[in-house]
Amino acid sequence: MKRCQSSRPTAAVAAVVAAVSMIIVLVSGTAIPSAAAAAAVEHTFVVSQVNMTHLCKEMAFTVVNGQLPGPTIEVTEGDSVTVHVVNKSPYNLTIHWHGVYQLLNCWNDGVPMITQRPIQPNHNFTYRFNVAGQEGTLWWHAHDAFLRGTVHGALIIRPRHGAASYPFPRPHREVPIIIGEWWEKDLPQVDRNMTNGYFDDYSSGSTINGKLGDLFNCSGVLEDGYVLDVEPGKTYLLRIINAALFSEYFLKIAGHRFTVVASDANYLTPYSTDVVVIAPGETLDAIVVADAPPSGRYYIAAQPIQAPPPDTQTPEYATRGTLQYSSNSRNSSAAAMPEMPHQHDTMRSFYFRGNLTAGARLHRHGRRRVPARADESLFVTLGLGSVCRHGGASCKRGGNLKESIVVANVNNVSFHIPAAAATPILEAHYYHRLHAGAGEEEEELAERPPRAYNYTDQALTPFGPEEMRLEATSRAVVTRRFRHGATVDVVFQSTAMLQGDSNPMHLHGHDVFLLAQGIGIYDAARDEGKFNLVNPPRKNTVLVPNLGWAAVRFVADNPGAWLMHCHFEFHLSMGMAAVFIVEDGPTVDTSLPPPPEDF
């Protein structure tokens, strides 16, 4: 059958990138040094709309430099990075550097109305940050209006002393694998719909490195799929990123196994498995040895995961690429398909994560061990509720969309992003202003929800009388302040209100230690004894299991205003977020500097 080829950057877009890059280099007066000797890495991101045709439909998509996924940023630990963003799209946006510590550099975290005002159409903005003390796979993405569905790319940090210093055999080649979704919709409109309580929008497919694969077709013409060429006996490091807006995925390669060696740019004790599980926002580094018969072709399959009925079922689409041996690249025989876990096998995800522990090189770059105890603790429920439309104080709740809006919440408060006319939260904090802006209501994230209930009772629903028995959700700019250097425990508790959703919770500006996870309701007297205080994995994104909990510990040692949120994009739009404000320490070296001069 014929195949539908993926789109390529247009000549016009390439010309714009080249021209803008040349202008920036001339203005700055700095040449870009060679990769071998470079301490400074410089990129230009031109954000624009390009037409792409898939599934028999041509649409304009917002991308960077005319490509999907966007450019890969490759750096060495200790390098400085400069990225000039030229916004030629019709949308406001920012770029977030997912997982980068941004130590004493919160101004460059890239979150609209938290750390900066968004970059408006036909405006430019320059991000500057260092990648000190980190090695591994991170990524970058837009942080506004669902645009990260097409505005994203890999950020790879290699060891300062080269690939020979990896704590695993040096790979023959390193390969980014980005799992995403294909949307036949205007993504900012999807964001507006969900912010207003309407949930009828779903993706049309899943992708591997921007390609839908041969499970999809247009009038019988198969979609182009990603192809990984390998050499027999060689070792490959797959840098896997879940850039999807909605779904956790199983990833499996027929006839091959993975050795998972890192997650979220933190080394792990090597873990051998035939399937990896990855949630939105997470990264995994996995070694694959090309040791299958080279005469064969092997599918690389990615399958979304969702909780089984009676939880809400949504359209989910698997995708697949192909692993083939270079000595047999002309082989057109049928590829072998791996036997995939069932899409409802959420416990497979739970046990996969339970097998991950920190590697022996955790403490490289002076990273601290997990503190033995916490200075303060939060118990944070993740749920749904409703607020009255049009700012009303009283309305019929329980799914009456004419009077109320279904929102997501943390401890029964739904996060409201400050309006564009307000002052960004970081700026308000730095200049000691009490509020994020005129007319913006702030509320402190409480240590616990306002009322305890049976959080995992599956009779609970946000669309009926049970929801109406709970307190009405409030909507505010939700913040929580921490003393510099405080050790903080957070237990995230999933609730049945979420209708089967797990929750990948991401904290900006910090890694957290994943101490434990469980199914059911967290009980401190019973569950604190399960905390791993020896070798817990370090993460920037932690999946809270469906009808379960996850306990994390972090040290609030990076001053600034850091967003904490669910990385399911619709949960963020609906309000499952808060801002963790870390106060300055006692010295200049522990205090946030003023904003950059050109900020």
From Swiss-Prot:
SUPFAM superfamilies cross-referenced by the UniProt entry: Cupredoxins
Annotated protein name in UniProt: Laccase-15
Swiss-Prot/TrEMBL keywords: Apoplast, Copper, Glycoprotein, Lignin degradation, Metal-binding, Oxidoreductase, Repeat, Secreted, Signal
Glycan-bearing residues: 51, 92, 124, 193, 217, 331, 355, 412, 454
Pfam families: Cu-oxidase, Cu-oxidase_2, Cu-oxidase_3
Primary subcellular site in the record, as a coarse category: secreted
The reaction(s) this protein catalyses: 4 hydroquinone + O2 = 4 benzosemiquinone + 2 H2O
Gene name per UniProt: LAC15
Residues that, per the record, bind Cu cation 1: 96, 506
Family according to the record: Belongs to the multicopper oxidase family.
Function: Lignin degradation and detoxification of lignin-derived products.
